[in-house]
């Protein structure tokens, strides 16, 4: 799914509003995913998955950092996320559906925290962006 110029602008503007909260929102999205889709917990058997867990916060920071990097390289997501794609496909062997579940959880989290900025157009642009990220992360499964 190709991001239009308007989509890219919307994604950059929305992620800019996230600002210093990116890690916290990433952790909240993970918590939301674990609660809404309990099967996703199977990939984190060594984590304390309770609310406010340092491990979930730490992984939320990693998710947010990867997304921040992706937002900065919207024209080269495959190159930007290549190492993460390798990691998730070959070492972690994460079921590709989980990227969609995390994307959904992140959209809900952003909608909760940025209600005035989360317009239908921004929602659509972020959804397309996260779908593209998911596609790149699962590209090496084939």
UniProtKB/Swiss-Prot annotation:
Name of the protein described by the UniProt record: Hemoglobin subunit alpha-1/2
Organism, as annotated: Ovis aries
Misc note: Adult sheep and other mammalian species produce unequal amounts of alpha-globin from their non-allelic loci.
Chain positions recorded as O2 binding sites: 59
Modified residues annotated as Phosphoserine in this record: 4, 36, 50, 103, 125, 139
Modified residues (Phosphothreonine): 109, 135, 138
GO biological process, one term: hydrogen peroxide catabolic process
GO MF entries: haptoglobin binding; heme binding; iron ion binding; organic acid binding; oxygen binding; oxygen carrier activity; peroxidase activity
Phosphotyrosine modification, residue list: 25
Residues that bear N6-acetyllysine: 17
Known role: Involved in oxygen transport from the lung to the various peripheral tissues.
Pfam families in the record: Globin
Annotated positions of the N6-succinyllysine modification: 8, 12, 17, 41
Keywords (A to Z) from UniProt: Acetylation, Heme, Iron, Metal-binding, Oxygen transport, Phosphoprotein, Transport
Family: Belongs to the globin family.
Residue span(s) of domain Globin: 2-142
Record-annotated disulphide pairs: none
Binding site for heme b: 88
Subunit architecture: Heterotetramer of two alpha chains and two beta chains.
A single GO cellular-component term on record: hemoglobin complex
